[in-house]
Amino acid sequence: MLNIGCHLSSSKGYKAMGKDAISINANTFQFFTRNPRGSKAKAMDLKDVEGLLQLMEENKFAKILAHAPYTLNPCSADERTREFAMEVLVDDLARMEYLPNNFYNFHPGNHLKQGVEVGIEYIVNSLNDVLKPDQTTTVLLETMSGKGTEIGKNFEELKQIIDGIKLSNKVGVCLDTCHVYDAGYDIVQDLDGVIQEFDRIIGLDKLYAIHLNDSKNPFASHKDRHAKIGEGYIGEEGIVRIINHPKLRHLPFFLETPNDLEGHGEEIKMLREAYRDESIL
């Protein structure tokens, strides 16, 4: 079964997101834990959360993915920005325990000309401070496009972060197809080679989720602009190869394409039709 969903608005609550997912034939979804450009998070409505959990169980949902706000930058040169990142991480991971055994994804951050090594050290220290042995949430580092001073533009940087984390069993990777293509990993012409490189450097056992996006910009552009499936440089054929790849097909896929709910439903319909049943592979 193809486990696929899209990014959904949390403005109407948790159960409403589950209902929206079901309405477009999705069996998972992604959401922001708080305003993506701000710091405030809504109070948890436990009845609403319980409603979502029940709906997920009844409809056999895959794990869902919470996304940290874009303002989170644990490797900033500014101490207050790093402190804010810590506060958000602590709060978000505590809130995620009301939605146990799911994923929490964040952008590693921008080192802002301090250098990659300094930035990675800050990220490692932050995660070592916030991760707990008894947490049920797996924290995912997102692959980045290499825009500006982003950390996570190559597999080696993500590996270095993971290697520095004491509770590394609580951490994994979310691969963004647009980001890796823009970063210079040719998933169109050499998908097998990219997967082998990921496995060699990080290990496929650390790959937990995929952001499924086409790219508005050409290969190795370091731009990070998502396109609708089939309307970018990766193309529909390239995306279909990804969801059917034997090393990836079991993972949950999350669309972040510039679409409304109906548009995401159309993409999901197309991808479900293109997904080959394992029994005929």
From Swiss-Prot:
InterPro entries on file: AP_endonuc_2, AP_endonuc_F2_Zn_BS, Xyl_isomerase-like_sf, Xyl_isomerase-like_TIM-brl
Coiled-coil segments: none
Enzyme type, top EC level: hydrolase
Keyword Zinc belongs to the record: yes
Species: Alkaliphilus oremlandii (strain OhILAs) (Clostridium oremlandii (strain OhILAs))
Catalytic reaction equation(s): Endonucleolytic cleavage to 5'-phosphooligonucleotide end-products
Top-level taxonomic group: Bacteria
Cofactor needs: Zn(2+)
Single GO biological process annotation from the record: base-excision repair
Gene that encodes it: nfo
Functional summary from the UniProt entry: Endonuclease IV plays a role in DNA repair. It cleaves phosphodiester bonds at apurinic or apyrimidinic (AP) sites, generating a 3'-hydroxyl group and a 5'-terminal sugar phosphate.
Sequence positions that bind Zn(2+) 3: H179, D224, H226
Protein's UniProt keywords contain Hydrolase: yes
Cofactor note: Binds 3 Zn(2+) ions.
PANTHER family: APURINIC-APYRIMIDINIC ENDONUCLEASE (PTHR21445:SF0), ENDONUCLEASE IV ENDODEOXYRIBONUCLEASE IV (PTHR21445)
Binding site for Zn(2+) 2: E142, D176, H211, E256
HAMAP family (UniProt xref): Nfo
EC number: 3.1.21.2
The name this protein goes by in its record: Probable endonuclease 4
Family that this chain belongs to: Belongs to the AP endonuclease 2 family.
